[in-house]
Amino acid sequence: MSNFEIRVNESYESFKNIDCFENACVVIDNMLRVLENPKNMNIYWKKIVPMIPKAYYDRDPKSDTKEELLYLVCSNSFYLDELFEKAEDEQAINALSKCEQECC
């Protein structure tokens, strides 16, 4: 296999050396941190937080075979961006931007 070929059996690796599972984990890390502030929590986030797959808490990409974590981040990127912008959290904004650009 050449250095330019993609191995299909590697979860979350669509481009060489891009770890989309970890990128999604970092976004969720930031989301949970921002939501610790009660002024940022609302009914929407109360519904989203329980949807975080077990693989996130285990930090195990192999247990997230359906890529649920990445799907959760990418399908909610607009709302995550709004949350992070409202909180004026540059670290979270940058993490989301990286995940969107590399993985979504």
From Swiss-Prot:
Q: Which Pfam families match?
A: CowN (PF20543)
Entry protein name: N(2)-fixation sustaining protein CowN
Q: Which UniProt keywords apply?
A: Nitrogen fixation
Q: Which GO terms describe its biological process?
A: nitrogen fixation
The answer to whether keyword Cell inner membrane applies is: no
Domain of life here?
A: Bacteria
Q: Which InterPro entries match?
A: CowN
Task: Give the source species.
Answer: Arcobacter nitrofigilis (strain ATCC 33309 / DSM 7299 / CCUG 15893 / LMG 7604 / NCTC 12251 / CI) (Campylobacter nitrofigilis)
Q: Which residues form the signal peptide?
A: none
Q: Does the keyword Transmembrane apply?
A: no
Family per similarity comment? Belongs to the CowN family.
**Physiological role:** Is required to sustain N(2)-dependent growth in the presence of low levels of carbon monoxide (CO). Probably acts by protecting the N(2) fixation ability of the nitrogenase complex, which is inactivated in the presence of CO.
